[in-house]
Amino acid sequence: MMPRLLLRDWPRCPSLVLGAPSRPLSAVSGPAEYLQHSIVPTMHYQDSLPRLPIPKLEDTMKRYLSAQKPLLNDSQFRKTEVLCKDFENGIGKELHAHLLAQDKQNKHTSYISGPWFDMYLTARDSVVLNFNPFMAFNPDPKSEYNDQLTRATNLTVSAVRFLKTLRAGLLEPEVFHLNPARSDTDAFKRLIRFVPSSLSWYGAYLVNAYPLDMSQYFRLFNSTRIPKPSRDELFTDTKARHLLVLRKGHFYVFDVLDQDGNIVNPSEIQAHLKYILSDSSPVPEFPLAYLTSENRDVWAELRQKLIHGGNEETLRKVDSAVFCLCLDDFPMKDLVHLSHTMLHGDGTNRWFDKSFNLIVAKDGTAAVHFEHAWGDGVAVLRFFNEVFRDSTQTPAIAPQSQPAATDSSVSVQKLSFKLSSALKAGVTAAKEKFDATMKTLTIDAIQFQRGGKEFLKKKKLSPDAVAQLAFQMAFLRQYGQTVATYESCSTAAFKHGRTETIRPASIFTKRCSEAFVREPSKHSVGELQHMMAECSKYHGQLTKEAAMGQGFDRHLFALRYLAAARGVTLPELYQDPAYQRINHNILSTSTLSSPAVSLGGFAPVVPDGFGIAYAVHDDWIGCNVSSYSGRNAREFLHCVQKCLEDMFDALEGKAIKT
């Protein structure tokens, strides 16, 4: 079970003004050091956030069985039903009581936080493809600002401005406003700032506003996942002031904050990046970055060799850098090329362990590629939106800006690593493994132009439910099956919430899919519309339950984790092939929509699966799908297109074309 990008469509920032005729340049001194000056302190609500509830065991069992129903035949389901009953009345009851007691003793956090960190950090698979996703920025609306040097400078300065704003407590708290006319106002903010932080959440709740957990934000900067035997560690050094830049597999560092914590003049940052872009050194014979794509135990062993070989100080500079800026030397050909580049690249020019890599291609196409153990995308999406808005609306430099007359050869340090023959062999082996894996990955995308959110809402259907129904229908059309499907939902409304799983495959989607795919002529348009409405209603219920911490996946995961921690024999429920099957997520799905995002993507979570990143926009639906050689992503997308056409036909009162 590997959660992907933050799914629920929380509003992140005011709508972007994309066609502003002129732009003020930020001076980056004094007030311009910050993106915003929130009158409510950033962490004002954190202490009073509600705690993530532990569902009742009987509710978890009911929800689990409901999710299993479309995946099992009658005899399999009866067997699973018996195992659930035995678990609920036996060892499960005992484990649940222990979980409740443990949760009572740890009121500073959530019951899932520790186990979830462990799940990520003990995983030994490469972080590339298995965990790290990407989000690509829309181009700067002013085309001349998409020059690589200009955009890299502006994104870097805006990112450092975000860092300063966050650490000064001046970043607006993350709040989900159900009634923004009441809660997203200066008057309310002036009032709530005086409410003690131990009570502030309740004040927001009274005006239908829901503050979200921001505990993950501190890992956004100066952070790296360090490979260790058996379990990795998250490392953060907030004192470091330098940026790490990768280009052609070479490593460079320079300060982006001065000794007083002020942002270095943007024209100096521009000069340093120009200096790096002018370095004509060829790609190193043994590009060290490949090691971050290795199996974690292999990388841990090689890292120790690096340290013992006299590279400790150099590695420390990589690990502690505010973030990693990757400058690529080629433009993007199309969306598929963009996805491959931002999801994995060629392995030489990313440090996959950094909390995030900010990638800027030759044509200014930019993306954030992030490591997933430290957070679920809540912080990344907020950072992403704020940086896009700031860099496009108040850019630090213009295309005609001249770089500072500074000696970058003094300010920029090019890092060099001493590599033993064992390390060189390690890099070569990592490269071979990386190249072989990437050859098996296919990515393809479609844009369905007939309609989107506006049309579906007029038909009183959940846009997300319709997209998920299209995936169920498409898989049935292509492979004749209903399979385990995963949609991640943020539980950031709770203290140290992570994610919960929505299980989109249901008896309703199965019935509706079979009607559309196998027997459309047997059903009237009205019947098909009714089935879609049933799917939408049930999906809405599942989504609400998940967001409120009332799914079944995290609860069962925590009980299993507790059993292992207490040395209890693995309960039979977890040995059931049905449990293995529902957690073998052939359809792993993730959605986000934001004015800043052009598209996102991730790899399948199982070898025979699809990784489906999608967004339902106002008048179109986008879908970016990955697969390994055992599945056909292009054919799947043809099926998705056909299924969306069929559903839109039915909603418009037309007969389904066979």
UniProtKB/Swiss-Prot annotation:
Pathway where this protein functions: Lipid metabolism; fatty acid beta-oxidation
Mitochondrial matrix topological segments: 26-178, 209-658
Catalytic residue list: 372 (proton acceptor)
GO CC aspect terms: mitochondrial inner membrane; mitochondrial matrix; mitochondrion; nucleolus; nucleoplasm
Main localization, broad class: mitochondrion
Protein keywords: Acetylation, Acyltransferase, Fatty acid metabolism, Lipid metabolism, Membrane, Mitochondrion, Mitochondrion inner membrane, Transferase, Transit peptide, Transport
GO biological process annotation, one example: in utero embryonic development
Membrane topology: Peripheral membrane protein
N6-acetyllysine sites (modified residues): 79, 239, 305, 418, 510, 544
Intramembrane region spans per record: 179-208
Transit peptide: 1-25
PANTHER family tied to this protein: CARNITINE O-ACYLTRANSFERASE (PTHR22589), CARNITINE O-PALMITOYLTRANSFERASE 2, MITOCHONDRIAL (PTHR22589:SF51)
Function: Involved in the intramitochondrial synthesis of acylcarnitines from accumulated acyl-CoA metabolites. Reconverts acylcarnitines back into the respective acyl-CoA esters that can then undergo beta-oxidation, an essential step for the mitochondrial uptake of long-chain fatty acids and their subsequent beta-oxidation in the mitochondrion. Active with medium (C8-C12) and long-chain (C14-C18) acyl-CoA esters.
Family classification: Belongs to the carnitine/choline acetyltransferase family.
Protein name per the record: Carnitine O-palmitoyltransferase 2, mitochondrial
Name of the coding gene: Cpt2
